[in-house]
Structures are given as C-alpha cells and as structure tokens.
Amino acid sequence: LFGVGLKLLVRRPLTAQIIGIPTWFVATEWLRSSFPFGGFPWGRIAWGQASGPISWLIRLGGPALVTLAVVLIGLLLALSIRKHRAPAYSLAGVVAVIAAYALLIPATPADRTVDVVAVQGNVPRLGLDFNAQRRAVLDNHVRRTEKLESDPDIVIWPENSSDVNPFTDPAARQQIERVQRSIDAPILVGTVSPEHNTMVVWDSEGPGESHVKRFLQPFGEYMPFRDFLRRFSEHVDRAGNFQPGDDNGVVHMNGVPVGVATCYEVSFDGAFRMAVQGGAQILTSPTNNATFGFTDMTYQQLAMSRMRAKEYDRAVVVAATSGVSAIVKPDGSVEQRTAIFTSDALEAELPLSDTMTLSARVGPWVEWILAILGLLSVAFTYRRGKKAFHD
C-alpha cells in the first residue's frame, strides 16, 4: 500500500515529496497497527530507535513522530544524493530534530521512590508445551521469590506466572499467600481464567485490584472466525477464548499507582497512555516470553519498553517468565537485565513520577493529523494526475 502512494508522490515537486512521503508512511503504519483484528504495531519503525538520537521525539508525539523523523531524514539523504543537490535538505532535517530536542522539558527530579523487585522464575523447558507444566512455572516463581534477601515495597511477577488459577485451585492460592506473607510485600501475579488474562495484586488481605489484558493477540489468545476456520482445521481450538478487559491498567501496590501493560500490550499506544492519564507513577510490562525461545522477539519487546519509558518519563519494570527481564530508567536506559532462560530477580529503587509529557497529553492526535496529511497528499496527487490525463 505504501508503494502505491509512493509511486504517485515521487512525481510531485520536491517540497510535496518531502511533506507527502513521510506522512503517507505514517498513514500506512497507522493502518497496519490498527487493522485488522486490532492491528499489529510490533513492527513500527520507532521501536528500532531505542538507542538512537531521535528517540526523544516520542515524548512530543509518540511513536508516530519518531517514524516521521526516521523516514524524513532517510528521504532527505536520498534526495540529496539522487538529485545531486547540496545537502541543504538533509541539514534542515538535522536542525529540525535538534530544535525539537531543545523543546523537551528536562525530567523532574523524583521526590519519591519505590523499591521494586522483578522476579523471573524461568520455565521447565522451551516451546509451547511448557504450558502443560503450569504447576512447575508457579513453583519456580515461588521459590525464587522466597530467596529474596531484601525487603521490597512491591514485587512484580510475569504474565502467566501462575497459570494454575489461584481462584479455583486451593493449592496454588496457598502457595501465593505463603510467599506473600514471607516477604510482607504485595505481589503482582499473572494468572488466567477461561475468559481473561489477568494481572492481580496479591497482598496480606488476599487478591485485590487487577488489570485484565485489553489488547489481545489474535489467533493465540482468541480466534477470529473460529466456527468458520474450524471447517479447515481442528487446531483452531488450541487458541484461547479470552475476552478483553476495559480497565485503564492502573493498580495500587503499597499505595503506589502502577501502570500495567501485559506483554503484547506494550506495543499499543493506548495501553500505557491510559495508565499514565489514570495516574500511574511507575510502569510495568509483565510478559510471558517463553514461546519466543532464543529469537530476537524478546529483545524487540524490551526496545518497546525502553521507548515507552522515554515517552512517559517513567521507569518501566519488565518481568518475564524466562527473560529478558529488565529495569528501565525513565530516560530509556537499561539499569539491569537478566539472561534468558535463567532463574533470577532484579531489585531497584525507582523514581515515582507524575509528569505529563506532551505525548501523554495529546494522545493519538499527532498520529491522526500526520496520517490525514499523508492521505490527503496521495489523494490530491491521484486526483491531479487523473485530471491531467483527461486534459
């Protein structure tokens, strides 16, 4: 789809190309990230800039603005080479990025901190069939938590850390209650029911506030067109039947408002945005990465968490069943991280923030405006070309 619009836009004058091509790319990326089945934003260009100099633009306009900058700079460089022009356009792009960086408000020093532990219990073995060993996964997280030598304020377990539902399994409930009493701190526990993928706060009074995963993975956590697709394969029923939640992702642990985006949710703009707008002062992305194996997907997901930390000026705690777990500072740097497929725990004293970055304030408007501008550029070019053909 991008190529169709690009073919039209390259015929336009230089200024029209500079405006139209990057914004059209944003439009097609928005479409892919939104449709079908909620979209697939995992492959957005912005995620590749976690260590790049233009990553700070995410604080102004979210991932869409970073994407725009990447495409714009690449386009200006290409034009300066192809057209044999002086690199004025490239220089203008660099100046624009520097100017945007100067607009950023420095991070406010934290008045309050919280002592957080992320527990990575590990899984018995690789692959999808680890879910058949649910009890062992819970046991691993209980044992690793019992080994903690510190007194944390809050403890984060990963998604699916208790795939044995503690609301229906007395033994699982007793395990969680026992380890919670031993550390005397609330634990964010990942568990499931037939309908929901849930992160629930477990403290001395038992289960409390929870976040039900809102952005679900199609063909895994639920199966679109299940009845129709069953005609072709009985394996469609291996997919879950989860229903999306409707909360804003904020849970309170020891009085701290924590924003939760479970696994796949971290790639969606709305997940952490709703949490920050709902008062979250620290963010966490509990995730089950066991099925990623040794692929790069777990590191791609970590890059997303780093960008979200920059976007909202908040620390992000990544707790994974099998890694990579990480402590990400508000500037996006990784303070600590684990190896994959090991049992480990990370502890850090992290700042609490109530800063509202521009991205948090304006929400999706920057992306919508850029996408509309790109769509109008292509539509105008198409209409103009059609009119010229008839003339």
Spans of features found by a protein language model:
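CN hydrolase (nitrilase-like) catalytic-core segments centered on the catalytic cysteine
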Residues: 22, 154, 161-162, 168-188, ...
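Residue-level signal for alpha-helix termini/capping positions
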Residues: 10, 82, 146-149, 181, ...
